[in-house]
Amino acid sequence: MTSATTAPHTTQTLQFHPRVAESVATQRGEGWSIQAVQELLDLPFMELLWRAQATHRTHWPQGDIELATLLSVKTGGCPENCGYCPQSAEFDTGVKAEKLMNVQEVTQAAQAAKDAGATRFCMGAAWRAPKDRDIEKISELITAVKDLGLQTCATLGMLQSHQAQALKDAGLDYYNHNLDTAPEYYSDVVSTRQYQDRLDTLRHVRDAGINVCCGGIVGMGEAPVHRAGLIAQLANLNPYPESVPINSLVRVAGTPLADSEPVDPLDFVRVIAVARITMPKARVRLSAGRQQLGDAVQALCFLAGANSIFYGDKLLVTGNPDVEADTQLLAKLGLKGTPNQTTTETACGA
């Protein structure tokens, strides 16, 4: 009688993107390996939450929740093919291309956001990369919003170094440019730009002295090792981002990822917790997909170290809990919004 042989177990390994590998080599210590991040993700759930909460209390003893509002100032018609995005011109999602909003429209929206309690106002434009004339118009919006006493953020696509400097000169506090996922899974999501393009934009933003807002999306069909790879990439940026938005994929009909399997809610909480542990001084933001999480999962995310949310009933073109619902949730949990201040944060150490 012969016994069946079992194939040896193999473990998939990922390598840092060259730009990040170089950054890791220059920082103190050894940085975060993908294996180390994966080991955190694999901890027993309660142990992981305990570690994340302990880290959070150490670095954020005030326990406030930053309220940020995101407005699409130029919607639709983007030439990129990001598989999650309903604003791509490549997909039939019902989103129509619109022109850039004017200063009066944007300042009215920003004032309304401030009146509702928001302290940061982010302006998003569906461009692959803005032209210099676009930067001039966006700079006017930044100055106008800044004059209202709000922190300013923009997400406009890829930037050149002189454009980043122009935004800084206009008073921009934060620039958002997400990595989306690990580099090894990136081509499964988008093919119209390279991972290196994203890292180059982040470098231009950092060199200009603008705070970095950079995170990713969970639930795009990625494997657990890709989630570990994304977190390692973010945590090993030197310095790591001041703001780290973690999105749960909003599946929009017409996009290639519309039929993706929903992420397990507790797996999403795990990502929040590990982001907090690996980037202790960052604002970890609950971003897109909060509406589908529900109050209980959001409460676990706050326990795991999330301390920022996008505030308002719409994120670009997808739904978000309305202001009243968020106000009630925060009150139920005994959480308070961050006091309004326009001073920028110092860079986070890696």
Swiss-Prot record:
| Binding-site residues for [4Fe-4S] cluster, renumbered to this chain | 78, 82, 85
* Sequence positions that bind [2Fe-2S] cluster: 122, 153, 213, 285
Task: Give the Enzyme Commission number.
Answer: 2.8.1.6
Report whether Iron shows up as a keyword of the record. Answer: yes
Establish whether keyword Nucleus is in the entry.
no
Give start and end of each Radical SAM core domain: 63-281
Q: Which GO terms describe its biological process?
A: biotin biosynthetic process
Describe cofactor binding as the record notes it.
Answer: Binds 1 [4Fe-4S] cluster. The cluster is coordinated with 3 cysteines and an exchangeable S-adenosyl-L-methionine.
What pathway does the annotation place this protein in?
Cofactor biosynthesis; biotin biosynthesis; biotin from 7,8-diaminononanoate: step 2/2
Q: Which family does it belong to?
A: Belongs to the radical SAM superfamily. Biotin synthase family.
Question: Which NCBIfam families does the entry link to?
Answer: bioB
Quaternary state and partners of this protein? Answer: Homodimer.
Q: What is this protein called?
A: Biotin synthase
Gene name per UniProt: bioB
